[in-house]
């Protein structure tokens, strides 16, 4: 199987799950993903943020706040809703993933009335995952936006349901870039070896981890230990900058 690094667009956008995982693993940590938000005005006005990310070198575009029941990406040419993801693939030549959020309803969200507020099509349910798979999504990431109340226990529960439904067809990633509004899951408690074990047993193919230095308490040594542990379980990892350092001036 070719590495992502050696693929042309037509090869990269038609991979099955096994090919997707193999192509990433063969690239040995050099695959770049970029998360974009499609519901806001594009940085380049009439060009999608996904295309902008691809032009800057992204191999995989991760669509955040993407509602599979009512898909919207500002700047995208008019297509049928079910063709939204495939149109992003056509325009970018990239792999495409989406975030789904296993919101813990017992945790009060601080985002009920703002841009980040949840919609039904963004929830990490088996039905939404099946819709995503039918739309051509390559990877589903179970994670949480700031303040939405996504706990690691909720991620495990959603993983189990989604894995049973589509786990043989689509790559599943799980983890958090920050505490996501859950008191007690900050710093090193964002993710632990026990969380990784539970995610793996629930069906995760890839473990999402904060990159060293992006969250207080997340050191290079700590993430090195977690990555090594995830690899020992046969899982891939993705480290993320999900706390605004990439947009800072200083």
Protein language model features and the residues they cover:
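Residues that cap or initiate secondary-structure elements
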Residues: 38-40, 104, 245
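Alpha/beta enzyme core
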Residues: 44-70, 74-76, 110-239, 244-250
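N-terminal alpha-helical scaffold/docking segments in eukaryotic complex subunits
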Residues: 34-39, 66-68
